[in-house]
Regions:
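Bacterial N-terminal signal peptides that target proteins for export
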Residues: 1-8
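C-terminal motif of bacterial Sec signal peptides marking the signal peptidase cleavage site
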Residues: 14-17
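N-terminal leader/targeting pre-sequences
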Residues: 19-197
C-alpha cells in the first residue's frame, strides 16, 4: 500500500508541475523576425521600374563645343523632359533622340547606336507612330542656348523598355521626321548617358 501511496503522491506532484504558470524563461524563444514587402513595391517591380527622375549630362563631340543637361521626370507612361544646352549656332534647329546604347565613348558618338525603339515602330513625329526615342527637334535661341520643356507620352524612365541606361543625343541638323530610320538629323554633336536619380 505504501507503494500505491508513493505512486499517487508522485503523480500529484507531476501534475502540479505541469500546471505551473508557464515554461521557465530559459525555455522561451524570442520571436523570429519575418521580412515583409513594402506596401508600395510589387514583387515583380525592380528599382528601375519605379524610377521617377533621371539626368543626362551632355558632353560635346570633338568639334562641337556643345554642353548641357537633360532632366527627365515622371512616372506611369509619360515623361517630362527639360533640356538646357549652350554652344550652339543662334537660331539653329537640332534633332534630339534617345539612342539604344548607353555609351558616349566614341568621338562621333556612334557608340550610342540607333534610336531607342523597343516597339519596332518607324521613325516619326510625336503625333504619328514613332520610335520611343524620337523627341521634338530643338531650337537654339539668339544667344545659341536651348532651354525647353516638353512631355513624351507612352514612355517610361525605368523598367525593361525605359530610358534609364540609354543615351540621349543632340544632332547637328533638324530632324525631318520622315527619312527612315533616323530623320537625317546629321552628325551627333552632344551625347549623355541617362542615369536614374
Amino acid at each position: 500500500m505504501r507503494i500505491a501511496s508513493t505512486l499517487a503522491l508522485a503523480t500529484v506532484v507531476a501534475l502540479a508541475a505541469c500546471a505551473s504558470k508557464g515554461p521557465s524563461p530559459a525555455a522561451v524563444s524570442p520571436p523570429v523576425p519575418v521580412p515583409s514587402a513594402s506596401p508600395d513595391v510589387k514583387p515583380t517591380e525592380s528599382y528601375f521600374s519605379r524610377t521617377k527622375a533621371a539626368v543626362a549630362t551632355l558632353t560635346p563631340s570633338a568639334t562641337s563645343g556643345v554642353t548641357g543637361i537633360v532632366v527627365f521626370s515622371g512616372g506611369g507612361t509619360s515623361v517630362d523632359v527639360h533640356v538646357t544646352a549652350t554652344g550652339l549656332q543662334p537660331g539653329s534647329i537640332h534633332g534630339f533622340h534617345v539612342h539604344d546604347v548607353g555609351n558616349c565613348a566614341s568621338a562621333d558618338f556612334m557608340s550610342a547606336g540607333d534610336h531607342f525603339n523597343p516597339t519596332h515602330r518607324p521613325h516619326g513625329p510625336q503625333d504619328h507612330p514613332h520610335h520611343a526615342g524620337d523627341m521634338p527637334s530643338l531650337l537654339a535661341d539668339p544667344s545659341g542656348k536651348i532651354d525647353v520643356r516638353f512631355t513624351l507620352e507612352g514612355v517610361t524612365l525605368g523598367g525593361v523598355d525605359g530610358f534609364v541606361g540609354h543615351a540621349v543625343v543632340l544632332h547637328a541638323s533638324a530632324d525631318n521626321f520622315d527619312a527612315q530610320p533616323s530623320g537625317n538629323s546629321g552628325a551627333r554633336i552632344a551625347c549623355g548617358v541617362i542615369a536614374a536619380q
